[in-house]
């Protein structure tokens, strides 16, 4: 599907999950698979994801606290002893994560024509390690730490738009997540959206987007 009639001023991206291979589930398995059978492990991973979302809906706090609190709550719910060291191990893995295999080539093609921007639920001290692995130049990288708010809060998106000096009508926002990105983008009037279907969440056509299976499909969306 193409949007050849619309050439955005910027293409804005979620990073973790959309571009970077987000490996929280793998980290949880490494820590707890010996204590949980497979059905319980899958439930633990679902709980961990849910608590991470819940932890970021209030006032901003460092991502290390988000990981710590969500892992502690998940362990409590699943009857597992929580250790501070486990949360530290998970947090320190984040900057080591690289891109999905489809990302570098797809981004590089688009970056030749349209400035690329990241809006990430990240810490300043971690995100550039991930960005450097993506294989394409970025016009700007904005973090939750800079915005003092995590997505899906509107404040994070508003910070990005203010920093770019543009309106919601000027960008194309690209994410694999409705709950973190595309729902808020819709509510804020970002009409041009791309859903990268990486299997994290089911389709939700109400929110109005172009679907691609991976970043290799992005150039075609903007007529490249």
Which role fits each region the language model picked out?
Residues 25, 104, 153-154:
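Conserved strand-to-helix beginnings and helix N-cap segments that scaffold or border functional pockets
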